[in-house]
């Protein structure tokens, strides 16, 4: 057990509802039960009881559940009081519980943090709880459930076990240098190392899919005024999210829409038309547009095809391309093909994909949807997949770098000591995902992002 105090919080969302739940965890959970209920319910059995105030008057009535340690979510004694979901009733009951000495309000994510600290789940599973609550699509929810049930962690634990065994073999090579068999050159270590590298590559691929499901893709629509940017936003969103007129400069601020393409979250951002600003309001809008462009995963460069026959971005607008970050992916959208008679199609112009479409009548929109999925490497078949966060990707990439460095030390430098160190660092990076090696500061940041009752 890592804590001696007892915490309480509302486990259901704020507001009115049919049921409201208060959760208590810690060594005084049984004291709370005795005080509020007049008894400690039989473990893991639902008991319908009155919830009593200090003067023995009834505050509410409902179901009480008691889970003695270690067989509870947090690994501590846990009491759940399930009453009516009125905010006044729940607040009165919460105040009554807080009158009991040694009880305090839980910090955000503290229940999950205690479950982690008491080895009821690892850090990746704890994060999956928050991801399940925040899931924005059915696929994201399924993947979060998989993570909660240990799908991600099992991959990590398997690789950590493989690295442990490999380190033992390498240490043997270091400790017995005079053996007839040259451990570093017999091919066994290289074969084992390649197996772990291959395992890690597979997990990184799955993790990138999981990150897409969780984080989504930020796409910024940019171009000159009246190119059809807002019409494209509306076409992708499937509703009139932006005002569309023939007047150039109608959009003066950033507009955001959140949609899904076969389960992939897509954050679409419509920006003000880029030109020399005619007033201060438009200038601010254009500056905000550039801020969004520079933070995008991909830019849809909108071109009014009735105004130019040029197809490469540098020909169409050299000043725009000169300001773009060189690593930022760009897709050219030649809009208004309904007016030019151009067929809806996707081609490439140099390094840039180009899509001819009509945002107004929807022609070519499905081509764009498919292109965005393909550009991000998204696979809608995520059976057995898991969600991943940016910190997970960073840890996996760090581990991959150390394994590649280790391979160089093995094959070219023939250095067992340096190989052993790279294997240790790779193992440490992987263990940060499940929380085996994680700083208290990182734990605080992770769990503080949870809701209060989790």
Curated annotation (Swiss-Prot):
Keywords: Cytoplasm, GTP-binding, Hydrolase, Magnesium, Metal-binding, Nucleotide-binding, Potassium, tRNA processing. One of its GO terms (molecular function) is metal ion binding. Residues 216-377 form the TrmE-type G domain. Binds 1 potassium ion per subunit. K(+) binds at residues 226, 245, 247, 250. GTP binds at residues 226-231, 245-251, 270-273, 358-360. Exhibits a very high intrinsic GTPase hydrolysis rate. Involved in the addition of a carboxymethylaminomethyl (cmnm) group at the wobble position (U34) of certain tRNAs, forming tRNA-cmnm(5)s(2)U34. Homodimer. Heterotetramer of two MnmE and two MnmG subunits. This is tRNA modification GTPase MnmE. It comes from Proteus mirabilis (strain HI4320). The gene is mnmE.
